[in-house]
Amino acid sequence: MTKIISLTPPQTNLPFPLMRAIKERRTKRKWQDAELPMQDLSNLLWAACGITYEATERTKSRRTAPSSCNSQEISVYVALPEGLYRYDETEHALVGVLDKNLLPNIGTQSMMQSAPVGLIYVSDYRKLTNPVFNNDDRRWYTSAADAAFMSENVYLYCTAAKLATAVLGLVDREGLHKLMGLSEHEKVVYTQVVGKPVDS
């Protein structure tokens, strides 16, 4: 699957107060049986880990969410009904990975059967090159924290955009790892679901 979807530019100037988004942020596990608009998908992916500072000859790029030592080890995969994509934050595009619907597999709860969009946070341990990451425990804790920053950004965007979202910790990581065709250096951290709320 080599399909590439160029996303529309993110709307980075939406007039929603940050403190209000923090106050109103909620986990919502029910959503409409409806597609998520591509503009919302563009916005929430940029919120997760979009580029805010371009790389130079001397420095790496910067993302919307921090990562330890700016390792940028977390990638966001996007599960849609038509297939699995990887978010390329440099090009702000979706890169096709699999022609298969993995939405039912990104969580163990029955609600996943109707999920419109699933985000899968994957850590590439090969990018954790700083000597401080000298064992798998440290690599895992760092990856979990860095993915959490990204998922919280998605939460705040969803609050502002009146979308429903929930992070899923009950994940068959080994099964999902195999279905996605990941390498031994890549680890599924957790997943997140986004959709239109039933009460909107």
What positions do the PLM features span?
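Small-aliphatic-rich amphipathic alpha-helix that forms the alpha element of a beta-alpha
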Residues: R25, L44, V76, V117-T129, ...
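N-terminal amphipathic, basic helical "cap/leader" segment at the start of enzyme domains
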Residues: M1-A115
